[in-house]
Amino acid sequence: MFDNLSERLERSFKILKGEGRITEINVAETLKDVRRALLDADVNYKVAKSFTDQVKAKALGQNVLTAVKPGQLLVKIVHDELAQLMGGQATDINLKGRPAVILMAGLNGAGKTTLSGKLALLLKNKRGRKPLLVACDVYRPAAVEQLRVLAEQIEVPIYMNLECKDPVQIAREGIHEAKAKGYDTVIVDTAGRLAIDEELMREIAAIKEAAQPDETLFVVDAMTGQDAVNTAKEFNERLDFDGVVLTKLDGDTRGGAALSIRTVVDKPIKFVGTGEKMEALDVFHPERMADRILGMGDIVSLVERAQEQYDEKEAQRLQRRIQKNQFDFNDFLAQIQQIKKMGNLKDLASMIPGVGKALKDVDIDDDAFKGIEAIILSMTPKERQHPEILNQSRKMRIAKGSGTSIQEVNRLVKQFDQTRKMMKMMTGSKMKSMMGKMPQMPGMPKLK
């Protein structure tokens, strides 16, 4: 995400490289380039101008320490202003109601129904909530069925009334169902609509009046850029929602919507969709997003994702196997499957400082994992436990069974051997000593 903007901003800061101090001339030249980068990223013109004016005022008002280079200072100011532009800090959703009612609204095709399922899963897994999905989209063919399938997939209950064509009535019934059965959160999925469609706008207002939601979220496709911002503004004038959810942010290389929407609409971005998986919904953290835009990574989010997938018993089991030099293809496969649960690889790479930039021209394909899994699953249990018995004929059989080539099998075996050697090194006394001086990372087995 934001790849184009990150690259352009990096080039802009190079204008100050070699400068001894910040002056009105070199700042003006740099910020002119920054403004162009923001406009090319589809940021609202007034927002871009106001942003660069604020950065300029702060940069010229700074007493620069001799140890701080002008370019470094400007990056710091731009970072802080970017974070403020996007809201300054994360804004939580209101879950105080009994039950807490969340109303989802937005355009057709923005991804409301999928987002409703993702939000239910996030609240269930990360907040310990007991959500109920309510299907109020009575217009789109198969909308109710789509939500039902998602509810089944994430193991969350759903309220449907296939006989009723009144979404206001269905919303009331769904909330009554939640109270009767002890669900503490109700997520109301509604039909997509345009702000200029008077009849449908009156309908969503009626649903809001009937449901009395604690939180009304406007779901918008980040890839529509400035159109998303304008639509959000029109909707807010009619509906007065509480926050924005940006979907498809992983596919948005420009970032205009994320950078403009808080200022133009005066409502916070609360969540962002970062992929197709049901787990790919994150709380929006402006500071972390500013880090990523400026190529500084997002280690905090990376560690949080790792902690979510951390299994202490599995880590201890792996630790014992490493210490006994028993690491095999079964363990290798388990580690790959754990990484897959954390999200798509390109997104994970962008969270590590410097790595996202280094790999910007590399095609990071999550499907590569499928090939690795196919190869390992085509091995016999004995071959997985004893990789040393993999001779040429066995490898040819594995390649045929997995639909891959002998070269791919050889490459995987080589990668596995390198991983196992590294694991063996980690059990050595020298490595133990080195690791003992380092703070323990979440998810990493301690070496004894």
For the regions a protein language model found, what residue spans apply to each?
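Primarily NTPase-proximal linker/entry elements flanking Walker-type ATP/GTP-binding cores
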Residues: 8-136, 143-164, 170-190
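Small/polar loops that bind or transfer phosphate-bearing groups
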Residues: 135, 162, 188, 219-220, ...
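Residue-level signature of catalytic and energy-coupling elements of molecular machines
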Residues: 16, 42-44, 78, 107, ...
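Generic secondary-structure signature for well-ordered alpha-helical cores
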Residues: 40, 57-60, 83, 87, ...
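Long amphipathic alpha-helical segments used for membrane anchoring, targeting, substrate engagement
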Residues: 2-19, 288-448
